[in-house]
Amino acid sequence: MMQKLIAQIEKGKPFFEKLSRNIYLRAIRDGFISAMPVILFSSIFLLIAYVPNIFGFKWDKGMEAILMKPYNYTMGLVAFLVAGTTAKSLTDSFNRKLESTNQINFISTMLAAMCGFLFLASDPAKDGGFLSAFMGTKGLLTAFLSAFVTVIVYNFCVKRNITIKMPKEVPPNISQVFKDLIPFSAVIIILYALDLVIRNSFKSNVAEGILKLFEPLFTAADGWIGVTIIFGAFALFWFVGIHGPSIVEPAIAAITYANIEANFKLLQAGEHADKIITSGTQMFIVTFGGTGATLVVPFMFMWMTKSKRNKAIGRASVVPTFFGVNEPILFGAPLVLNPVFFIPFVLAPIVNVWIFKLFVEVLGMNSFSVNLPWTTPGPLGIIMGTGFGLWSFVLAITLIVVDIIIYYPFLKVYDSEILDEEEGRKESNSDLKEKVAANFDTKKADSILAASGVSDDAAKASNITEQTNVLVLCAGGGTSGLLANALNKAAEEYHVPVKAAAGGYGAHMDIMKEYQLIILAPQVASNYEDIKQDTDRLGIKLAKTQGAEYIKLTRDGQAALDFVQQQFEN
């Protein structure tokens, strides 16, 4: 029955893969990735300013203002910045479809989107200048609107050559300025017109109007059904091999970051921070140790199984999973597309967010009010992200216990299956050894090989003689680091001229020309056709990997080097 259910879900895989590659959703996701240094930097000052309050220490007003200035001048402008980074990402996607000699200038689209955003989100101040109330997280939806309109208008103009053309004698940089003038002007006029219409009709700016329009949706998303559907989708998509966050994250990005800001404001006012859907909820509650809430799973494989294979997989997966990189257990066990683990893989994240919601709404625990790096270990992320409250420690322990209870019966079933397989192979191998020993004497062959100096190291020789730079891409840069590290270690050990780097898909466009080979981790393998347009244009080799194959390469440096070599032989 479980196999039939998985087969039905897999029928929708092509549609969801296409959805994950949607250029607008990808632009939102990549726009946030580009702005992440700003988001994380600002959170440092929140922690310094307000965590001491828990221990009875409060900064004086002057010092608090000093500590909050970096936050207000960075996170307070995040929507303004995201308008530009989202426009840049969308421009890259449109440029793939345009001739290489007639490309959209991404710097110009970034500037136009940011200027257009100011028309839609800022109000004039009485003493000159403009107000910034909607330039932070409240203006994120408007930032996306500005970015999308900007790039669509630029694409329309550039594709149809609706630009000012200069004589060939004019330097290219000057010609580009005039080429951008018409689309830039068109964007500003369109967005300014929209601003005038909304202000005259509804007596508010566009950002405020959009926020009011989506407010019922934000409220519904924070409810029991909302969190179940949203966060259950993360695991459900990943289980059938589709990177769930690529689909779900862009759809809820504006809500998660707006709620973080709202929770912080509530805490500042001495009130209860009760917004459930936040970036912290996603990273440290729902994906507690990675998608599927797998923090406890490697430890369970290591300590609660009898199979040698399962114990080895657990040991190899513990460290990366502890830091949120759970592909070694996802594809090594495997958990994904494994009928035995379908129920716990989807159920554990949902139960986790239900428990968190109970802690917040019934026990009065504060929700997340600080953005932290996604690689922060789950328990530590819960404690730090919610302000070091007592309930956060209790919650972290509770989630660990509950997730063990959810996974345990299914793990025992799976371990029993693997044990039976191991026993079968053991008997088969024993019979085979006896037959070989009875019919062949390998001692003579072994002595000849030893005398000739043939060793394992000789077999590890590589045909790669020129410096080869390899870029490994995944969704966030964590999983890709596993393979990049394996390649670098093996290259150093066997003296092969290979250098590997890890990166996140979406942040690769400006650096890919420095590499001879790009390898896609399973998370982003569905983007193969899109990135191939770029690699073909630049003369770069491109390879994609499957789950178990990728994990094998991360654990076997020689195999990883062989994989690199094969890409240049094909």
Curated annotation (Swiss-Prot):
The modification Phosphocysteine is found at residue 474. It is a multi-pass membrane protein. Induction: Induced by lactose, galactose and galactose-6-P. Repressed by glucose. Residues 9-410 form the PTS EIIC type-3 domain. It is found in: Cell membrane. Pfam families: PTS_EIIC, PTS_IIB. It catalyses: lactose(out) + N(pros)-phospho-L-histidyl-[protein] = lactose 6-phosphate(in) + L-histidyl-[protein]. The keyword Kinase applies. The phosphoenolpyruvate-dependent sugar phosphotransferase system (sugar PTS), a major carbohydrate active transport system, catalyzes the phosphorylation of incoming sugar substrates concomitantly with their translocation across the cell membrane. The enzyme II LacEF PTS system is involved in lactose transport. This is PTS system lactose-specific EIICB component. It comes from Staphylococcus aureus (strain COL). The gene is lacE.
